[in-house]
């Protein structure tokens, strides 16, 4: 049974009555850095905060080093302040799962899961420990409307990537950098694994005013030679087809990983699928990869994201904040996210 978290709009300390439901999120934070952006996120008074992965940088085959990285994050004053003020939810990406770009063959994935659940203490921890992976789902309520949060696990079951062994033979003027991977088209390749796909199909049948799908890696971008859902085109299409098959409306994605922020819009589905990427809280990158689906951005400074939902106004707003304040804002109407 999905835990139902009730956020009453009548409680003055929760800013739902005038502002609706507010979900803050971010990714890519190094445990040894100041993480001052977490204090900025706290100042937005969100109803929940989602860590989208690379919540620590472990990069190891030693479980003691993973644990030490979590302990370092636990001692960070800005993390402590955020934890005291708002409910935290989390999934993982590669650097906190274990190693850069790894998938289902990472040998410490079960030990890593135990440390993840011990650190974040997810509300459904008992249920989470009963199956492989760390995928989770939650329901929040505001003004009689349910808002669903689905946290995917894009590491535990992900097939191996197809590495470009000779980059010089794969040069292309469209990519002003050295690509690492090619798309994988084999039928048995997977991002989520069959068990998680079956679970996701059930979650998408749960009635909700808005469904937020959290993926550590970007969903709505084109292939760019780095890690994205587009490395597994069949899986990307499977997601679109599943949303259509269950006739799930009002779905949006949030993602991290890439060390910059942007809003993407995938118009190849039956209705536009938006993906608000926020990365990183402390980590940065020198450039943004090509993305024909980019609607806004990129924001190259350290950042965090916010989804602000006002169901009674039929509105959803995408926001990106940096140390200097608001950098990206886009409001859409929920009826844009409906089958025609």
Language-model segments: which ranges?
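Bacterial Sec-dependent N-terminal signal peptides
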Residues: 1-19, 243
């Amino acid at each position: 049974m999905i835990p139902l978290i009730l956020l009453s709009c009548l409680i003055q300390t929760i800013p739902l009555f005038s502002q609706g439901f507010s979900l803050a999120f971010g990714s890519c934070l190094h445990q040894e850095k100041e993480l001052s952006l977490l204090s900025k996120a706290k100042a937005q008074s969100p109803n929940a905060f989602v860590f989208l992965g690379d919540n620590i940088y472990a990069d190891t085959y030693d479980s003691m080093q993973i644990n030490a990285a979590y302990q370092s994050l636990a001692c960070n004053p800005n993390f402590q302040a955020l934890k005291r003020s708002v409910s935290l939810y989390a999934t993982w990406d590669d650097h906190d799962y274990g190693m850069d770009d790894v998938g289902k063959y990472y040998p410490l994935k079960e030990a890593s899961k135990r440390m993840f659940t011990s650190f974040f203490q997810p509300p459904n921890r008992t249920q989470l420990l009963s199956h492989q992976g760390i995928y989770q789902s939650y329901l929040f309520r505001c003004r009689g409307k349910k808002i669903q949060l689905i946290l995917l696990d894009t590491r535990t079951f992900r097939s191996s990537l197809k590495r470009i062994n000779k980059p010089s033979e794969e040069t292309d003027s469209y990519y002003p950098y050295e690509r690492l991977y090619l798309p994988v088209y084999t039928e048995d390749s997977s991002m989520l694994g069959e068990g998680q796909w079956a679970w996701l199909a059930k979650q998408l049948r749960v009635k909700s005013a808005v469904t937020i799908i959290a993926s550590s890696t970007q969903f709505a971008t084109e292939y760019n030679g780095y890690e994205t859902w587009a490395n597994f085109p069949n899986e990307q299409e499977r997601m679109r087809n599943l949303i259509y098959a269950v006739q799930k409306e009002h779905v949006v994605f949030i993602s991290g990983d890439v060390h910059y922020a942007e809003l993407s819009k995938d118009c190849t589905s039956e209705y536009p699928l938006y993906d608000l990427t926020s990365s990183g809280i402390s980590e940065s990158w020198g450039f943004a990869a090509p993305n024909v689906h980019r609607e806004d951005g990129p924001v190259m400074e350290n950042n965090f994201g916010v989804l602000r939902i006002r169901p009674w106004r039929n509105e959803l707003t995408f926001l990106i904040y940096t140390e200097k304040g608001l950098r990206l804002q886009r409001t859409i109407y929920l009826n844009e996210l409906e089958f025609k």
